[in-house]
Amino acid sequence: LYVPDHLPKPGDPGHAGHVARLVVEAVELLGGRTLVLTTTLNAMRAIGEYLQTRLDPAANVEVLVQGQSPKRRLMERFREGAGDGRAGCVLVASASFWEGFDVPGDALQLVVIDKLPFPPPGDPLFEARSQRVTREGRSAFAYHALPEAAVALKQGAGRLIRSETDRGVLVVCDTRL
């Protein structure tokens, strides 16, 4: 687990750009084998665009971004990884890749999570549950938001280790951790 302490706060407008720069260095060293999980579509697009324009062509890494191809195709291509003349891959994705996406083996060595996955403000279901917890005299943050974020973080981190022999690095780009 690595939590960079030099990044701006997650709410800072430049946060996604800083995450993208951190990812470029790692992806070039690993030859891809990286999954970037974002908590918003805006961050996903910003990081994906940055990687597509800034990765060194000599690194031989294909940038896959959720929404630019069908999900099944992105998953298949990422699992193929490098080899037999294929480039390595970095996949930048949001919500639907946080769970149920398994990549056992060497095709995945690094998972980067842009920030703690708290439920989005204004979500009616989240708001209703938070109000219920508050009416019960408990803290909505401690008893609802934080546990939901912890479960989502565990799901995202779980993309990295799928078998006893898997290993890799989890980077959470949120100084609040």
Question: Where is each model-derived feature located?
Answer:
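ASCE RecA-like P-loop NTPase motor cores
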Residues: 1-177
